[in-house]
Amino acid sequence: MAISAALVKELRERTGAGMMDCKKALEETNGDIELAIDNMRKSGAAKAAKKAGNIAAEGTILIKQGAGFTALLEVNCQTDFVAKDSNFLAFANQVLEVAAAGKVSVEDLKAQFEEARVALVAKIGENINVRRVEYIDGENVAAYRHGDRIGVVVTGTADEETLKHLAMHVAASKPEYVNPEDVPAEVVAKEREVQVEIAINEGKPKEIAEKMVEGRMKKFTGEVSLTGQPFIMEPKKTVGEFLKEKGATVANFIRLEVGEGIEKKEEDFAAEVAKQIAASQKA
């Protein structure tokens, strides 16, 4: 049976799959569109399983305020092109709505949206992953998104404009803790050990190296804490000094960046093209 363009168009509209996939599905079912849809749903699950091994390190960070808390969500895909796709963003926003409705765990979000995720993988041809969700308590908050890749929420006693500026600072400067004294003892001890070793390797006697490290450790805890960092909008002041002038405090913050901690697989362009050609010849 000859498959008409109109039938292919209808199947594309109903499934969102590619033209060649639709044509192939209709040929396999002799033009039975309902059976083709069933088969594509089944093969879509298989396709999603194949894509699951692909590294998803692109994506988006979304933020939404709930009742007394704010949710930050990361959803990943494989390419920055898909990260801007309307279907991908619609899926991510659906997950966000549920997360912000009641502090739903990432495990429960994954389970609830698995069927929709599988369908989306089949539709766009990339692995999709609901990677993480974090929540920060407080009503007095400011949120900042730098493009789609970085999301920050800061809570404290400051006014909205001040908190927004602090959120922008966190996005740019990547502090790990609020105050220098919040840096865990084990982190300080590990850094001290490294700095002593560096000083000894520079030729300093151990007892002198130990004394030198005290200054370096103060610098280290300042660099990794929000209040110890130079404020990006007034670099001559630390964030702590800026807050003191404002009579304000920061209670907590969360910063998420797309793909942080995910090891990307690097392939050169020629190798990627060769891989695609080989795959098409096997099909």
Curated annotation (Swiss-Prot):
InterPro entries per record: EF-Ts_dimer_sf, Transl_elong_EFTs/EF1B, Transl_elong_EFTs/EF1B_dimer, Transl_elong_Ts_CS, UBA-like_sf
NCBIfam families found in the cross-reference section: tsf
Protein name: Elongation factor Ts
Family: Belongs to the EF-Ts family.
Chain spans, region Involved in Mg(2+) ion dislocation from EF-Tu: 79-82
Annotated compartments: Cytoplasm
Pfam families with a match to the protein in the record: EF_TS
Key word Cytoplasm present: yes
Name of encoding gene: tsf
Main location class: cytoplasm
A molecular-function term among this protein's GO annotations: translation elongation factor activity
Biological function: Associates with the EF-Tu.GDP complex and induces the exchange of GDP to GTP. It remains bound to the aminoacyl-tRNA.EF-Tu.GTP complex up to the GTP hydrolysis stage on the ribosome.
Upper classification of the organism: Bacteria, Pseudomonadati, Pseudomonadota, Gammaproteobacteria, Alteromonadales
SUPFAM superfamilies per the UniProt record, alphabetical: Elongation factor Ts (EF-Ts), dimerisation domain, UBA-like
Keyword annotations: Cytoplasm, Elongation factor, Protein biosynthesis
Species: Shewanella amazonensis (strain ATCC BAA-1098 / SB2B)
A GO CC term attached to the entry: cytoplasm
